[in-house]
Amino acid sequence: MIKLVNIKMEYDKKVVLDNINLTVASGETVAIIGPSGSGKSTLLRLMVGLTKPSAGEIWIENEEISQYKENALNKVRLKMGMVFQYSALFDFLSVGENVAFGLRQHTKLSNKEIQAIVKEKLRVVGLVGKEDFMPNQLSGGMKKRVSLARAIAINPQIILYDEPTAGLDPIMSAKIDKTIMNTQKIIGGVSVVVTHNMASAFAIADRIIMIYEGKIIAEGSTAAIKESDNDIVQKFIGDYKNIKQLVHENEVLEIED
């Protein structure tokens, strides 16, 4: 479980997040949407302890972490997996070693045990047999999936995704969405996805939260968000519908897998 209570975040006297209250239960996938600069990625940074709030509480399971020091935070982070916007793979390590990195850093497992886990996590994300590939041999979508395999290697209770479909074409984005959904079925736990991609949000989320100018202005199921009478929400969804129509009119002819 993740729970944020009365969170306020200020930078240089500018309020970035204002009175944020949200809970994500175990087994739930929540998508956080909103325009650029609305505070979405700041929320992720708060959840993982990279930023401290100006006020409020951050609960990870039964621990309130908002004032934790780095050593205590590192223990909490072992419960989390993070999938970054640009994959953040180590270019000098193979796919297998990228996935194994956290296991080597934070466990005392044997090399044989680590290799077995690496193979299993690559199977989960649909990259069987890619252990010896280098990152520069992979497409953008494959890099995202390696990043996800690395994130779930330590069997986290929480997975945080920062723009997992950024820079991908619609069909590759749909493949990433499917991977996220399959991973959630296998791992369970909590998934929080920050995204601009409304098609992804509607596909993967049990619940959607929209942030605008640092405040939660809408929250609910995908159906509730689609039917919201909030003008800002409808404008955001309307932009998505226009893009979706454009994609249908101009089909993607070449896909890199």
Feature names for model-found ranges:
Residues 33-35:
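The feature captures the beta-strand-to-loop junction immediately N-terminal to the Walker
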Residues 134-138, 142:
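Conserved ABC ATPase signature
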Residues 64, 111-129:
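Conserved ABC ATPase "signature" region
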